[in-house]
Amino acid sequence: MAEVKISIIGAGSATFSLALVKDLCLTPNLSGSMVSFMDVNKERLDAVYTLCKRYAEETKAKLKLEKTTDRKKSLQDADFVVNTALVVGYSGYREGWNIGFKHGYRFGGSYHIMHDEGFWINFYQFRLFESTVNDILDICPDAWYLKLANPVLALRLADAIFF
């Protein structure tokens, strides 16, 4: 397979990034490919980059790795864009849950299906989604866009309506 560039937006999440890098390292057809880690939080980005680089070295994967806090730089020449970004972070979710609890909302047994999520979280996620898609259309219009960031269904519906 030809070498490809994979841009990971929101790469500061160790859970998502490490799982993804594990799969990339163990896929021989991606040998020689570039993985571009992008996150606005430099401290988290540096930590994830260091862990992923170490894993790639230990598995002898022939991946090229780079890191940046500049989304447009990460998107340059990308063949695949993976969005794992959560704008408000876990603390934002906690704040949203606390507001819901304060006003008597029940969460139906799952914090992933929250009554207040549409108001508290999705506004920020939609804004990030829209700006990311617009950058992709400008910078790497032929790239495949994979959304792993929640709310996946709501973002997919917005994709169908607006793009």
Segments predicted by a language model, with ranges:
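Metallocofactor- and cofactor-centric catalytic cores in central/energy metabolism, strongly enriched
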Residues: 2-97, 110-163
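Short, glycine-/small- and polar/acidic-enriched structural segments
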Residues: 16, 102-103
